[in-house]
Amino acid sequence: MPPSRLAREAGRQAFGADPANYHDARPDYPDWVFGTLRSRCALGAGTTTFEIGAGTGKATRRLLDLGARPLVAVEPDPRLAEFLRMANLDPALTVQVSAFEDAALDAGAFDLGVSATAFHWLDEEAALAKIARLLCPGGWWAAFWNVFGDDSRPDPFHLATRDLLQGSANPSTGERGIPFGLDREARLAALKRTGAFDIVDTATSVWSLVLDEDRTAALYATYSTVSLRPDRDSVLAGLRRIARDEFGGRVVRNMTTSLYIARRAA
């Protein structure tokens, strides 16, 4: 029997209990992602931008630094939204505490829309239809993910913790045995089905994240499938023990970063 799935509404409130730990423990996005936004998606000075599910701002700060202004960040969790505001005291940034479905954004007003490791929490078809309405002709949409895991490489820590972590899945798991952010065929097909984009493209990179036992526990504490468990503390203690006793305090997680971009047709 496949694992149960966290409801979208529950998942959207799963990350705000400790925003500072989330911001510190989650890895940054590779530089090539933002380089692509600059070279392909016209990110630069004065790019009118919206960001879906901005969280604590792991991508927001980079967007602001590269010229996204004004930038409207949409974040449904008020705790994450407050952290985002306080960490980015930039007059170009506006934070809307709202689900994207309900966000008040002007149609045709944006040069760029972005979502970083958050788009799987939305209904893809409905969200893409709204995104297309918000972008001006020639505007760009970009969704990217840092995905934990890569089946093409050995992953001993994942195998060692599989029984401990059994439980609910979340939408990032995907529907076809492929993580949502890595299901190239499905994501590109959804973009094309809108009929709103004249260019769609994707790129990926693989890399490694090296963690000690404390950083391992801190990272897993940010996973919705861990943070919402009633036995969260014992699971984190178990992860810490495995990292220390079976891996000598050095855990290597396989990472894949994926990026999907699409240009709004005239």
Regions found by a protein language model. Give the residues of each.
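Class I SAM-dependent methyltransferase SAM/SAH-binding core
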Residues: 50, 56-103
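A short, conserved alpha-helix within the catalytic core of class I
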Residues: 122-131
